[in-house]
Curated annotation (Swiss-Prot):
This is Chromatin modification-related protein EAF7. Residues 85-445 are annotated as: Disordered. The keyword DNA repair applies. Residues 98-107, 188-205 have a biased composition (Polar residues). InterPro entries: Eaf7/MRGBP. GO terms for biological process: chromatin remodeling; DNA repair; regulation of transcription by RNA polymerase II. Residues 213-224, 255-264, 280-299, 393-408 have a biased composition (Acidic residues). It comes from the Eukaryota. The keyword Transcription regulation applies. Residues 87-97 have a biased composition (Low complexity). It is found in: Nucleus. Keywords: Chromatin regulator, DNA damage, DNA repair, Nucleus, Transcription, Transcription regulation. Component of the NuA4 histone acetyltransferase complex which is involved in transcriptional activation of selected genes principally by acetylation of nucleosomal histone H4 and H2A. The NuA4 complex is also involved in DNA repair.
Amino acid sequence: MATLDENNPSKQTHRHWSIENEIKLFSLLCDYKPAGKNKQHNIKIIINNINESLDSKEEPFSEYDVWNKLRSLYDLEKIDQIEELSTENTSTEETTNQVSSGSANITKDTKNAKTTLDAKEPIQDKKEMDKEKSESSSLSTPEPPQRRTRSARDTTKSKRNLRDTPKEKSQYNDEEITSGGAEKSKVEVSSTSDHTDDQSPTPGSTKKGLDEQTNDDMSDIEDVDKDKGDETIAKIKKENTSEQEEDKNKKQTEEEAEEEEEEGDHVSGDERESKNKDTSEDEDGEDNEDQDEDDVEVIEDSHTDKENESSSEESSPEPMTKRTRQRTRSTHEKTEHTSPNIKKRTRQSVKFDDKPAEPSDTGSRKRRAPPGSVSPPHPPKTRRRTRSVTHEIEEEDASTQSADDAEPEIIKVETRHTTRRSSRISMEPSSSTPNVRVRRSSRKR
């Protein structure tokens, strides 16, 4: 509240502002500026807002108090100048905006007019070109369009290159379309001429007719391009499928050839195994023959030794004939006549520990082929030695004579079963035969 000074009563003193009131003043200044044309109206609003927040005990603020406080803080004259300049600028901007909007409308109108003129010009140019082409085509015969032949390289293109084919074909398809377009233009020109004769030409009707013609031409061109593009794609697909089928057939033939080679290898391996088995069986048969021959030689050697001993006791010793591996029949007969009392021993006559002699089956020693072998078993190649009838008659006569003259000598000989490795027969001296010699065969294996 303003108070009068005692020394100078005409002057009013400044009112004291609290911090809360100053804060309210500053916040209101942000919304309502006390400058420019509306400064009085804004000051009233500020005063009313401040007085509403005061208590009933405090006096309300006057307009003078608010202006004094603002002058102490701000330079109000400069603020007024700035606000005036800003208002002038805003007014000029508004005027310029109005002018620019008017000019923009004018330019739009001019542009629209230009576009309409530009659209009319190409239509007229097209008309003239169509007329010239129709005249030239009527004078000269139309040449058939040359079709482009596809090379072998084009057929082997990948699927990625399929996108490029319609573009390439559209270039040389334009030539074909132009000839068709010329014929269409003839028909269109004739139809338009008929209409113009019947009806009076108007600018609106001419524009519509030209637009419809251009749209029809473009649609026809697009249809032709689509049809040809579909045909080319179908051809390329057929070629790709044929190539895939050829590749499959080649792979199948190669696989069949490989299978035949593998079967031939298996058959050759089986033949080799059968041959190896045959050779092993042949070797086993030869070994059995050798063993049989060795056994016979050992028995013959023992027989000749005993004959020599008996002959030395009865008569003077005779020179021994040199034994060879192959004995003739004459030597056997001589030995039999010189010693009639001694019983000739063979495989069947020799007694081993009072047991009947068991004939050795050479076929039992043969190796058995495995069950998986393919080749059939071969017959044994060993020769079985048979005794003639004359030898049996001579032995019976000798046995009857020896039974009358002297007691038969029974020699017990312990032998081992002949095996593949045994090349000798161990002979132990017994009481009945004190001097029994066993000689090793000189045959080399």
